[in-house]
Curated annotation (Swiss-Prot):
Its EC number is 2.2.1.9. Belongs to the TPP enzyme family. MenD subfamily. Transmembrane segments: none annotated. It comes from Corynebacterium glutamicum (strain R). Pathway: Quinol/quinone metabolism; 1,4-dihydroxy-2-naphthoate biosynthesis; 1,4-dihydroxy-2-naphthoate from chorismate: step 2/7; Quinol/quinone metabolism; menaquinone biosynthesis. Catalyzes the thiamine diphosphate-dependent decarboxylation of 2-oxoglutarate and the subsequent addition of the resulting succinic semialdehyde-thiamine pyrophosphate anion to isochorismate to yield 2-succinyl-5-enolpyruvyl-6-hydroxy-3-cyclohexene-1-carboxylate (SEPHCHC). This is 2-succinyl-5-enolpyruvyl-6-hydroxy-3-cyclohexene-1-carboxylate synthase. InterPro entries: MenaQ_synth_MenD, THDP-binding, Thiamin_PyroP_enz_TPP-bd_dom. Homodimer.
Length: 543
């Protein structure tokens, strides 16, 4: 079989990646045609073709996050590469091993005004430094880069390809699936000493892990953190911020002496206040380069702990009571019909209908926060969300990528495990092109996307932007109603759609998806003009 020098270089590059990846997302283009034909000739890789590089890069990111291994996205030159920047930013801050493999014009064309040609070297800045490859003897840099200590970071390999790009015949099929190997190489910040005789509270966020020695400590855990043994509701932070609380004639000290941060918590302002309180001793545990210390006053930073002392039963009771009061308050507010059917109700329905073995994806903004308020995380449910830079970009693609990664773990099962995704309407519309899956591409076999549609930006109702004095310009600047027909959009992409407008019908629709496979969008039409009052009612329960 004949081949061009460009194809020889492309094959060497894919050969160097294949031991580390199982999935590659491919975008069509001319300059990357040697890579495209080589990838489709491989029998050891799953290839997912997408036409939009931004959505494609988020598909690759979610595959990598869910599988905890590298996934590559491949594209042609020019703006195609620039479209990957949002996904690269999320990958860098969430420590996801996303690989961007871009085709480029040869150096002699850069700066000449040649079509579809920009300077791609350094296009992602320090988020993913560029490794340039122009010759066969430079391909070894790929393996060297992937072997570096900081394995959980994005990479950018920029492959300069000159004409002739491809030979007239297709490459022969080759490659035997043997299973890619990958090991995360975490950063060790050392051991710190923790005295559990002090009133200690753990706050666990994204990238948290089960820390030996802290298993029984009261823990505020975000939905993407492991389920703690002694969970504390996030709204309880409002109670624990107080020096003392009076109840039934007793006065108890509720403020913790020591807060231990594990991973990267970011969701709740009250929780962040606990982390930032200079009167509270702060320990930060991390296995990455990010030290989550919003108040910049950490007393110690480590990755493991040496435990001394024992927890007081009174402190455990205080945390349990504060948590129970907060959780009951949320359910009381949900039962209050004056707020109507809101995004918080949608999150409660999703959480209440999850089963052991399900996987949950939640986009940034209100969905992940609402899930936290209604009781996540749960045992037996893996939860994923973009918490690196917490953008709404690529949410549909990430939901699909999560489902594809989950079903790839169980190729021999008659029915793929269930994946449920909770998105807001703006997140859904922002990445509506993510629904476009070609007829020959792997498709989600058991995915339900729930869209909480309040016709705009509901989160801004809860922030300073929702204040009465700003209401005259609120709708245009923040509410941004769109009046889009999600049903028609789904029909255009060939995706099954169901519409509900109340809690009971939503629960029925979600339960129905546990009985059948397929790819379904459930649109829950909600209100947002009561979200601010609903939030104030929640705060009243704990203040």
């Amino acid at each position: 079989m004949s081949s061009t020098p460009a194809q020889d270089l492309a094959r060497a590059v894919i050969d160097s990646l294949a031991p580390h990846v199982t999935d590659v997302v491919l975008c069509p283009g001319s300059r990357n045609s040697p890579l495209s034909l080589e990838l489709l000739a491989r029998q050891d890789l799953r290839v997912h073709v997408r036409i939009d590089e931004r959505s494609a890069s988020f598909l690759a990111l979610s595959l990598a996050r869910t599988q905890a291994r590298p996934v590559a996205v491949v594209m042609t030159s020019g703006t195609a590469v620039a479209n990957c920047l949002p996904a690269v930013a999320e990958a860098a801050h969430a420590h996801i091993p996303l690989i961007v493999l871009s085709a480029d014009r040869p150096a002699h064309l850069v700066g000449t005004g040649a079509s579809q040609t920009i300077n791609q070297t350094g296009i992602f800045g320090d988020l993913a430094p560029t490794v340039g490859i122009t010759e066969l003897d430079q391909v070894a840099q790929i393996a060297e880069s992937l072997a570096q200590r900081a394995s959980q970071i994005p990479r950018h390999f920029n492959l300069a390809l000159d004409v002739p790009l491809v030979a007239p015949e297709l490459p022969e099929l080759h490659g035997e699936a043997v299973g890619a190997s990958w090991t995360h190489r975490w950063i060790n910040h050392g051991e710190v000493t923790v005295d559990l005789g002090e009133h200690t509270l753990v706050i666990a966020g994204d990238e948290a892990w089960e820390v030996e020695g802290l298993e029984d400590v009261p823990t505020i855990a975000e939905p993407t953190a492991p389920k703690p043994y002694n969970p504390v509701h996030p709204l309880a932070a409002e109670i624990l911020l107080k020096e003392q609380v009076s109840a039934e004639g007793y006065v108890v000290n509720t403020r913790p002496d020591h807060v231990i941060v594990v991973g990267h918590p970011t969701l709740h302002r009250g929780v962040l206040k606990l982390m930032s309180d200079p009167e509270i001793k702060l320990t930060v545990l991390s296995r990455t380069d990010i030290i989550t210390d919003p108040g910049r006053h950490a007393d110690q930073v480590g990755s493991t702990v040496k435990v001394t002392g024992t927890q007081e039963k009174q402190w455990l009771k205080i945390c349990s009571a504060a948590s129970e009061l907060s959780a009951d308050g949320v359910r009381d507010v949900l039962d209050n019909q004056e707020f109507g059917f809101t995004g918080l109700h949608v999150a409660a329905a999703v959480a209440d209908t999850l089963g052991t073995g399900d996987t949950l994806f939640a986009t940034a903004s209100n969905p992940i926060r609402d899930l936290s308020l209604v009781g996540m995380p749960f045992d037996g449910v893996d939860t994923f969300s973009p918490r690196g830079v917490a953008g709404i970009d690529g949410s549909v693609a990430q939901a699909i990528g999560t489902a594809l990664a989950v079903q790839s773990r169980h190729p021999d099962e008659i029915r793929a495990p269930r994946t449920v995704a909770l998105l807001g309407d703006l997140s859904f519309l922002h990445d509506i092109g993510g629904l476009l899956i070609g007829p020959d591409e792997p498709r989600p076999e058991n995915l339900t996307i729930v869209v909480a549609n309040d016709n705009g930006g509901g989160i801004f109702e809860l922030l300073e932007t929702g204040a009465d004095g700003l209401r005259p310009n609120f709708e245009r600047a923040f509410g941004t109603p769109h009046d889009a027909s999600i049903a028609d959009l789904c029909a255009g992409y060939g995706i099954e759609h169901q519409a509900v407008d109340n809690l009971q019908d939503l629960i029925i629709a979600l339960v129905d998806t546990t009985e059948v496979s397929g790819f379904t969008v459930i649109e829950a039409s909600t209100v947002r003009d009561t979200r601010r009052a609903q939030q104030q009612a929640l705060m009243t329960k704990v203040r």
